[in-house]
């Protein structure tokens, strides 16, 4: 896949493109379905296939106080897109100038003049342009003026439910990891930097890597204990682990912390980038009467997680299929 970063007014020598456009947060199964339609149409038409996306969430420009809760970082999104076998990913720099373009002007200046799009396949509910005020019929009419065929793709349904990033976020907020992963088509994965913590886990025999909550723009699932797979950004192998998200009530914590215990691992991780893939929620976070009671529960959690990997998911270390 070619990744091409685009700014307004730049010119590029490009072959004719069959494209789709969107933010594609998480590149979930609905997105994958849409992209497969683009690839099929490109092959039939003898053109290149393309995804047009943005370098930041549009609401980060349109709303100054907007705090994104993303399913995927830009780097992860591009990696996921590359796995669809799309030819090109065009990453538009989203700023106030781009946001001000009407759908007509966007199609004329960006799709037609810059990207040489000849066929545009849009999602069943996708709208673009300033204030997203135009309709699919408007896009079709504009396309006729510019030599762009505009096609609406069907919705992708699973169990009679439309797959969307919003539904996935709601599942994650509720701790429904398996449901979210089914809609994504892969285990939900976050990335953040490892920072120093309180060392409470180490004292109980369960040393943890603490993630920098503020450095991560991705959505954190509901508070609780999770079965996870973990790897360092620059490594290959995945390790089993258990993660706690919450306020550490046994220690009277008041702020959110995210910490993960890596199974069968020793070493210094501080300052490194860690990827965590969520497999299943094990239990809610509880306040225990003593450190001994908490340590005993953590031992049981670890045993349950290992059984889950062995007997239910049949996942071994180093083979999990994630971004």
Predicted segment positions?
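A glycine-rich helix N-cap at a beta->alpha junction
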Residues: 73-89
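Glycine-rich, highly charged phosphate/nucleotide-binding loops
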Residues: 69-77, 101-107
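Phosphate/ribose-recognition catalytic cores of enzymes acting on nucleotide-derived substrates
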Residues: 197-323
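N-terminal catalytic cores of NTP/NDP-binding nucleotidyl/phosphoryl-transfer enzymes
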Residues: 10-73
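Residue-level signal for inorganic ion chemistry
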Residues: 28, 81, 120, 180, ...
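Classical nucleotidyltransferase
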Residues: 100-207, 289-293, 319
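Short acidic-hydrophobic, aromatic-tinged amphipathic segments that line or gate anion-handling sites
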Residues: 2-9, 90
């Amino acid at each position: 896949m070619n990744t091409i970063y685009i700014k307004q007014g730049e010119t590029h020598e490009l072959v004719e493109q069959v494209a789709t456009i969107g933010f594609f947060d998480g590149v979930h199964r609905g997105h994958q379905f849409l992209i497969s339609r683009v690839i099929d149409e490109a092959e039939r038409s003898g053109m290149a296939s393309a995804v047009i996306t943005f370098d930041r969430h549009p609401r980060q420009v349109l709303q100054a106080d907007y705090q994104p809760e993303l399913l995927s970082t830009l780097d992860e999104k591009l990696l996921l897109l590359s796995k669809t076998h799309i030819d090109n990913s065009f990453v538009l720099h989203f700023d106030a100038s781009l946001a001000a373009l009407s759908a007509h002007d966007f199609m004329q200046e960006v799709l037609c003049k810059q990207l040489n799009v000849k066929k545009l396949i849009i999602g069943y509910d996708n709208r673009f342009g300033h204030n997203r005020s135009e309709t699919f019929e408007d896009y079709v009419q504009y396309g006729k003026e510019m030599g762009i065929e505009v096609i609406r793709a069907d919705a992708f349904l699973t169990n009679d439910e439309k797959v969307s990033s919003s539904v996935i976020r709601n599942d994650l907020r509720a701790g429904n990891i398996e449901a979210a992963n089914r809609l994504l088509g892969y285990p939900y994965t976050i990335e953040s930097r490892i920072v120093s913590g309180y060392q409470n886990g180490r004292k109980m025999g369960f040393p943890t890597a603490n993630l920098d909550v503020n450095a991560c723009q991705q959505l954190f699932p509901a508070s609780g204990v999770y079965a996870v797979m973990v790897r360092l950004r620059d490594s290959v192998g995945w390790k089993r682990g258990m993660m706690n998200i919450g306020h550490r009530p046994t220690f009277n914590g008041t702020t959110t912390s995210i910490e993960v215990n890596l199974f069968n691992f020793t070493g210094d991780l501080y300052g490194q980038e860690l990827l965590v893939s969520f497999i299943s929620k094990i239990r809610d976070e509880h306040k225990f009467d003593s450190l001994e009671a908490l340590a005993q529960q953590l031992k049981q959690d670890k045993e349950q997680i290992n059984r889950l990997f062995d007997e239910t998911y049949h996942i071994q270390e180093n083979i999990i299929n994630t971004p």
